[in-house]
Amino acid sequence: MSTWANLGLQDSASPLMEQLIFFHDHALLILVMITILVGYLMFMLFFNSYINRFLLHGQLIEMIWTILPAIILLFIAMPSLRLLYLLDEINEPSITLKSIGHQWYWSYEYSDFNDIEFDSYMIPTNELSNDGFRLLDVDNRIVLPMNSQIRILVTAADVIHSWTIPALGVKVDGTPGRLNQTNFFINRPGLFYGQCSEICGANHSFMPIVIESVPVNFFIKWIASKVNS
C-alpha cells in the first residue's frame, strides 16, 4: 500500500520491516545484474561474426550455467530463510492484542486487561474530517506502546480475512476457528494504516486498520481511562 509521492515501499516503523526492505533491495540488485548481463549477451550476439565450433556440445559452458545460477540462488535463499525464522519468533511480548475479522469491520481485545474491547469501523466519506484519509480512517484506533514487544492474535468470525500493516511488515491471515499469531516492535510514534488483504466479500475494501503508536506513559493513561470509563 503506497503513501503520498512514494514510488517504493513505505518507510519502516519496525526492525523486521527494515530487514524486509534490505532483503528486497538485495534481491532487486541481483535481478538488475542478471538483466544487464543477459541484455549485454543478447546485444553482442547480433554483432558477433564468430562461429562457435562447440554449438551442440560444450562442457565448460554447461558447467558454468549450472553452477552459477545455483550460487546466485544460495545468495537469495540464505537471507530469505533467516528472515522467515525471524518473522516467526515470539520474544517475551509486553502486551497481547487480539484481532477478530468480521464482514466488514474489525474487533479488538486487549488480552492483558479486563473489559477493554471495541469494534473498529471505517469512517464513511461524508462523515470524514478535513484531515482524514478516505477509505483509511476508522472510528476507533488501536492504541499501542512504542518500543515494546507486541504479540497479536488474529482470527475471524465468518470468512477468511487478513490483518495487514505494511509499515510494520505484518500480514496475518484471520481464519475462522483458528488463532494465528505474530509479533512486532514499533520503534517510532505515529499513525500506521493498513487494510484487509484477503478478498472477503462485497465490502472488502472498506475495513481499514489504524494503529496509533504512543510512548508507554501515554499508553498507560489511555488504558486507565478505558478501565475507568
From Swiss-Prot:
UniProt topological domain (Mitochondrial intermembrane) ranges: 1-26, 83-229
Residues engaged in binding Cu cation A2: 196, 198, 200, 204
Cofactor: Cu cation
Membrane topology: Multi-pass membrane protein
Keyword line: Copper, Electron transport, Magnesium, Membrane, Metal-binding, Mitochondrion, Mitochondrion inner membrane, Respiratory chain, Translocase, Transmembrane, Transmembrane helix, Transport
Bound cofactor: record note: Binds a dinuclear copper A center per subunit.
UniProt-listed PANTHER family: CYTOCHROME C OXIDASE SUBUNIT 2, CYTOCHROME C OXIDASE, SUBUNIT II
Protein name: Cytochrome c oxidase subunit 2
